[in-house]
C-alpha cells in the first residue's frame, strides 16, 4: 500500500494499524482498564473482543478505535476500575477516534467518560460514537458524557446516532453475546 510516505522499497514512516481482536479480556480486581492506549499511542484498534469489568481507554494520541466489542460492567464501584466506563478518555484531544458498534452493560447508567469533552465543540473533544447498544438496569438512568446531562442531550450533539438503550438481559444472555464475539458470530 502506498500512503504517500513510502520510500523506493515500499516502506513507510506511517505506522500500520495494530488491531487487538477476538480476545477475552477479564479485568482483575486491581486492574483499571481493559485496554489502555496511552501516552501518544496511535493506530490502535480494539475490535471484536469480549471485555469483563473493563472497557477501552485512551490518553493522548490519535487514530484509535473501539469497535464491535461486548463490554460488561466496566466502572463497577468498589473495584479499582470504579468510574471508568465503556470508553474512557482522559485528555479531550481527538483525531480520528471512534467508539462504534459496541454492546455495553453498566451497573449505573454511566456509559462514557470523556473528561475533556466540551459540548460546544463535541466533535473535536470527544470520540465519535454511533450504532452502539447500551444495557442499563431498570433502576438506572442513562447519563450522557460531556456535561450534556441526559441521553437525549448527548444525541442532540450528534453523538451516538443509531445507538439504542435497552434493559439489561440475563447474565446468560450477556455471556452468550460475548462468547459469540470471540468465537465467531
Protein language model regions, located:
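Glycine- and acidic/polar-rich repeat regions and solenoidal domains
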Residues: 1-184
Amino acid at each position: 500500500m502506498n500512503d504517500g510516505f513510502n520510500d523506493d522499497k515500499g516502506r513507510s514512516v506511517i505506522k500500520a494499524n495494530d488491531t487487538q481482536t477476538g480476545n477475552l479480556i477479564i479485568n482483575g480486581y486491581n486492574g483499571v482498564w481493559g485496554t489502555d492506549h496511552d501516552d501518544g499511542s496511535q493506530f490502535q484498534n480494539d475490535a471484536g473482543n469480549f471485555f469483563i469489568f473493563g472497557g477501552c481507554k485512551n490518553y493522548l494520541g490519535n487514530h484509535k478505535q473501539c469497535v464491535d466489542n461486548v463490554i460488561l460492567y466496566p466502572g463497577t464501584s468498589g473495584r479499582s476500575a470504579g468510574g471508568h466506563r465503556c470508553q474512557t478518555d482522559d485528555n479531550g484531544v481527538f483525531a480520528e477516534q471512534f467508539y462504534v458498534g459496541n454492546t455495553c452493560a453498566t451497573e449505573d447508567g454511566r456509559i462514557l467518560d470523556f473528561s475533556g469533552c466540551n459540548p460546544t465543540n463535541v466533535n473535536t473533544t470527544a470520540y465519535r460514537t454511533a450504532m452502539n447498544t447500551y444495557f442499563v438496569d431498570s433502576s438506572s438512568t442513562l447519563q450522557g458524557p460531556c456535561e450534556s446531562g441526559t441521553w437525549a442531550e448527548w444525541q442532540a450533539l450528534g453523538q451516538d446516532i443509531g445507538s439504542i438503550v435497552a434493559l439489561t438481559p440475563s447474565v446468560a444472555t450477556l455471556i452468550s453475546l460475548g462468547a459469540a464475539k470471540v468465537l465467531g458470530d
